[in-house]
Amino acid sequence: MMRLVTVIASAACLALSIAPGTATATAKVTTSVGASASATRAASGVQDWPAYLNGPLHNSYARSQKAITPRSARRVVQAWHFGRGTEFVASPTVSGGAVFIGSETGWFYKLKQTTGAVLARRFIGHEKAKTCGAIGTAATATVATDPVTHRATVYVSGANGYLYALNESNLALRWKAVIARPSATSSDYFDWSSPTVANGRIYVGVSSQCDKPLIRGGVIAYSQASGRKLAEFYTVPSGDIGGSVWSSVAVGPSGDLFVSTGNGPPANQLLGYSESIVKLDPSTLAVLGQFQVPAAQVGTDSDFGASPVVVGSYVGACNKDGIFYLLNQSSMTLDWETRIGDASYHGQTGECIATPAYNGKLLYFGGNQTTISGVVHQGSVQARAPGNGALVWETPLDTGVTGSPSIDGGGVLAVPGYYPTAGSPPVAVYLVNPASGQILRRLAHGQEFAQAVFAGGWLFSADSDGVYAWRVKR
């Protein structure tokens, strides 16, 4: 999988260099004056968005957020804008009255939720252009309660190959652990995967930066308290390359892990656990089951870049072949599949890499290029029945969607646009009525690779020109 346009860099060592975390109190930190899903919520609150896709289930549903509704959407205004001219690929994490986010410059920020003022910042790595482009932080942070100290802690991966545990209050370093250190001469290892915190462990995927070259992909499990490496899973045999884990690990109701994987080497794209959704034991990372994309559906650069979503006793993910696959968690057999968008050809038609939002009733998809009523559109937003994938409604967009949609309890879906269409209005975050597919508002700004999130009665987004906060004007 070649990771998108302006946000790319690249890949490859043949062996994974992994070491346990080491505690240290040094680093570049500047502060201003002044676990499981349950563990994540304990550190945050019902008004927060504490992790990528709102937690290990990856449902992107903020049930308690009801300020932004179909009626109030017309009164949504920009409250603040931080970091003008700075690109952000990671999505905002909101917890305890602050927004946590890393930038393409390598700086990780804690911003005041109501004003955007910088409360603290820490440099966590930036990779210069080598065989891929220059890149900073792409992974979204998780805020969760440390199982030993019971203090709120921020977990985030840096471009320098480390997983960081930071004090939530001032971003001081608690520990850091090696994921996989990038080469000095090629853009090999890079962490796109946002850390998943569950049951005292942290799970992180290992991937290349942009397939130049491929690396041996996998998943690493760490102790949440110390950063010690507990287990590792590789997608391809020792000595082989491929099977990057670009996405983030999902956790099912029973605690089992679900991982979506990238393509194998060109000579065998289905090597090992490549092009698969894999079920892993949460303690040992032993393989408990696998669904692999049928060979007939494997094309050029078609792999899983989207993170899995848990749908009751099922789990699913969209492949870059444009198809969403829903599986029975117990048997890992296919329940149904449906086409969301066109197959990707190295991003030329966009990519189906957004995880659908799920509110317990319907699945809401943001898609890449597709044809609706005989007309080709750059993207779409769709609602589908979780039982069989049947289309409930579909709304064409003049931009493709890369960031995952999110939904609040007030009845509004936020869909970030990324791929612009020549001659069309600027890309935007679309506010959509989930009952009908009606576009309620366009919050226009830059290209949005990240997910827009609902927290504290507001909406937070990030794009190629900074971080934004949106609220309902009284």
Regions found by a protein language model. Give the residues of each.
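Secretory targeting and sorting signals
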Residues: 1-27
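N-terminal compositionally biased, intrinsically disordered segments and leader/signal-like regions
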Residues: 7, 23-33, 37-41, 141, ...
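N-terminal functional modules and adjacent low-complexity/disordered segments of proteins
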Residues: 9-13, 56, 63, 114
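Generic low-polarity alpha-helical segments
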Residues: 20-30, 227, 389
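Sequence/structural signature of beta-propeller modules
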Residues: 29-70, 474
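Extracytoplasmic/lumenal domain signature
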Residues: 45, 64-86, 94-101, 106-137, ...
